UniProtKB/Swiss-Prot annotation:
KW Zinc-finger (keyword) present: no
Protein name: ATP synthase subunit beta
EC number from the UniProt entry: 7.1.2.2
Enzyme's top EC category: translocase
Reaction equation(s) it catalyzes: ATP + H2O + 4 H(+)(in) = ADP + phosphate + 5 H(+)(out)
Family annotation (InterPro entries): AAA+_ATPase, ATP-synt_VA_C, ATP_synth_F1_bsu, ATPase_a/bsu_AS, ATPase_alpha/beta_chains, ATPase_F1/V1/A1_a/bsu_N, ATPase_F1/V1/A1_a/bsu_N_sf, ATPase_F1/V1/A1_a/bsu_nucl-bd
Domain of life: Bacteria
HAMAP family reported for this sequence: ATP_synth_beta_bact
Signal peptide per UniProt: none
Binding site for ATP: 155-162
GO CC aspect terms: plasma membrane; proton-transporting ATP synthase complex
């Protein structure tokens, strides 16, 4: 017999439900409310968050609560939110509760999984380290991606996090050919729509599952949609032994949704108004994103940085979970250098000669040294000008400016608004080109020859065209 309760109170996204004696649903159980007053959401799913006493549970709604009234019947499903997984989810867009939102009919999955699951045991985890090529020069050279690892793209508003993420989806999904899962967490619906059509045009959609809970969704959906995507990815890793790519845009919105709900649940706010359970919430998600002996989940996460402050509790808590951090800088974006990656602030755990090889490591470190020297000299240049520098410093500055421009790159996904065709650059070409710049082989080329090119041969070609024209 089903367990039925009644609504006693509705406050925004939080719904209180009273059950009979001894029939309280477990924490994290999904409850279903038939809501005939709301045509957009006739069946609302809520998740139990707290037991308040007096047989009342406090729940978080996964959709709009308009039309709910006190006394409505609520049914306990007896399980957490269950979402369809497996090949039926590929090429489709679903919401937080696993319902399709692409108007292409139901998702006929043979299996459903709960969105809340324990992280893999320590002895099931895989510790092999391997580099994953992205085709983006600055990333492959200075911030190499570990296969089966977690990378974060940190940046303030409008510095290009989503564009880099989309380029990685385009490059890695095409080259890697495996299965991708994309979680749109509290971002623009327009970007979700663009991504769907880009993946369709690129022919990678049939190998991707998309899970959206965008900006207009209630906080309950935004706080759980990343877990829905993770359940899809875990199925491919554990049951089908696949190497899966998990893209999350934006992990900050997951935290933000948690803080919106936290106050409604009556918890005391902690630093900067965030929920007191910030570390636990994020840890519960991040610990499940890992490689096991069966397969791997490689995750790329965009992290919004409020007011460009990396010490804000949300980005600061995220840092500790990641294998690599790709920090996007507004100063570099202002120079017109895209991707606006800060090569001195970004780090990767696998930039190690034992993993990437001695040549790659030495080129990467020398590039960083030249850029750091240029940064140190900038105050002197600003006050006294270039003429006051020694010949050696002048050469360092000239090479640093060439390196800085060569770290820019035209993207496939930005082709629509730049008009420049995107380029995928192989890792060995990247290392060879930067070694050449460091050794002075390209000192005769102008700085602008290096701007927005793919391989070094494109820069040389620009120089040759100029020489012929002259």
């Amino acid at each position: 017999m089903s367990n039925i309760g009644k609504i006693t109170q509705v406050i925004g996204a939080v719904v209180d439900v009273e059950f009979a004696d001894g029939n309280l649903p477990n924490i994290l159980n999904a409850l279903v409310i038939k809501n005939p007053n709301n045509a957009d959401c006739p069946e609302l799913i809520c998740e139990v968050a707290q037991h308040l006493g007096d047989n009342v549970v406090r729940t978080i709604a996964m959709d709009a609560t308009e039309g709910l009234v006190r006394g409505m019947e609520v049914t306990d499903t007896g399980n957490p939110i269950m979402v369809p997984v497996g090949s039926a989810s590929l090429g489709r867009i679903m919401n937080v509760v696993g319902r399709p939102v692409d108007e292409m009919g139901d998702i006929d999955a043979a299996k459903s999984l709960p969105i809340h699951r324990p992280a893999p045991e320590f002895n099931e985890q895989n510790t092999n380290v391997e580099l994953l090529e992205t085709g983006i020069k600055v990333v492959d050279l200075l911030i190499p991606f570990p296969k089966g690892g977690k990378m974060g793209l940190f940046g303030g508003a409008g510095v290009g996090k989503t564009v880099i993420l989309m380029e990685m989806i385009n490059n890695i999904a095409k080259q890697h050919g495996g299965i991708s899962v994309f979680a749109g967490v509290g971002e623009r619906t327009r970007e979700g729509n663009d991504l769907y059509h880009e993946m369709k045009d690129a022919g990678v959609l049939e190998k991707a599952a998309l899970v959206y809970g965008q900006m207009n969704e209630p906080p309950g959906a935004r706080a759980r949609v990343a877990l829905t995507a993770l359940a899809c990815a875990e199925y491919f890793r554990d049951e089908e032994n696949q190497d899966v790519l998990l893209f999350v845009d934006n992990i900050f919105r997951f935290t933000q949704a948690g803080s919106e709900v936290s106050a409604l649940l009556g918890r005391m706010p902690s630093a900067v108004g965030y929920q007191p359970t910030l570390g636990t919430d994020l840890g519960g998600l991040q610990e499940r994103i890992t490689s096991t002996t069966k397969g791997s989940i490689t995750s790329v996460q965009a992290v919004y940085v409020p007011a460009d402050d990396l010490t804000d509790p949300a980005p600061a808590t995220t840092f500790s979970h990641l294998d690599g951090t790709l920090v996007l800088s507004r100063q570099i974006a202002e120079l017109g250098i895209y991707p606006a990656v800060d090569p001195l602030d970004s780090t990767s755990r696998i930039l190690d000669p034992n993993v990437v090889g001695a040549e790659h490591y030495s080129v990467a470190r020398e590039v960083q040294m030249v850029l750091q020297k240029y940064k140190d000299l900038q105050d002197i240049i600003a006050i006294l000008g270039m003429d006051e520098l020694s010949d050696e410093d002048k050469q360092t500055v000239a090479r640093a400016r060439r390196i800085q421009r060569f770290l820019s790159q035209p993207f496939h996904v930005a082709e629509v608004f730049t008009g420049t065709p995107g380029v995928y650059v192989k890792l060995e070409e990247t290392i060879k080109a930067f070694r050449g710049i460091l050794n002075g082989e390209y000192d005769h080329l102008a700085e602008n020859d290096f701007y927005m090119v793919g391989g070094i041969e494109m820069a040389v070609e620009r120089y040759n065209q100029r020489q012929q024209a002259a």
